[in-house]
């Protein structure tokens, strides 16, 4: 039987590449930076332009499909995930990197049907790396099959996380305390690339063993989550329970052993869900 969503995935790859070209061209120029929820939650005209370009192109081809887009939500639309085929889009994951020309920025597209992710596309455009995964078909980077690492010993692991965009003292205290706890186990190291999608793709490649973060949004992880699982990894909630796309928290790891150990060590930050008003 033909794959009903393969055409959508092929189109997503084409659009991500086109969007990446726009982003890479714009990164060379001076940009007008605006603020969203805080002085460090940044948005540029390119974020907005790329999202509009992606959504209008998809709407034209698939008029019955739904959308959740980072900049649409910032403009007042709701993050409601229904059973309808839904494109979950982050036009520039790593906007702060983009503003500073730090070369890790990604176009991220996740596609859900019946609230389950069917495929993910993450284009790390400055690097020229196209990460893709289709449910049940494996994960790839530029056509090369991906496989997570086999490391089960946390003391020999390399972790990835982010400090996040919150500057609330209590949140910052928990973020730093969690890093300190993990760092002193000890782990081999903790890295931050500045984009959740690329961090997760690094777990899929085996370059990092696990990634965790609280405060991310569904559009940060919808594309990359399936890339991790199709490369043999696991997604988990930071409490150790099942991963929930709308919960704003995630552990993406090479295996359950590392994921559960990280969940055991970290304090949970209370957050409003993406699908709450």
UniProtKB/Swiss-Prot annotation:
It is found in: Cytoplasm. Disulfide bonds: none annotated. The keyword Secreted does not apply. Pathway: Polyol metabolism; myo-inositol biosynthesis; myo-inositol from D-glucose 6-phosphate: step 2/2. GO terms for molecular function: fructose-1-phosphatase activity; glucose-1-phosphatase activity; glucose-6-phosphatase activity; glycerol-2-phosphatase activity; inositol monophosphate 1-phosphatase activity; inositol monophosphate 3-phosphatase activity; inositol monophosphate 4-phosphatase activity; inositol monophosphate phosphatase activity. The modification Phosphothreonine is found at residue 168. It is an enzyme of class 3 (hydrolase). Substrate binds at residues 70, 92-95, 194-196, 213, 220. One of its GO terms (biological process) is signal transduction. Mg(2+) 1 binds at residues 70, 90, 92. Mg(2+) 2 binds at residues 90, 93, 220. Signal peptide: none annotated. Its cofactor is Mg(2+). InterPro entries: IMPase (IPR033942), Inositol_monoP_metal-BS (IPR020583), Inositol_monoPase_Li-sen (IPR020552), Inositol_monophosphatase-like (IPR000760), Inositol_monophosphatase_CS (IPR020550). GO terms for cellular component: cytoplasm. Its EC number is 3.1.3.25, 3.1.3.94. Homodimer. Belongs to the inositol monophosphatase superfamily. This is Inositol monophosphatase 1.
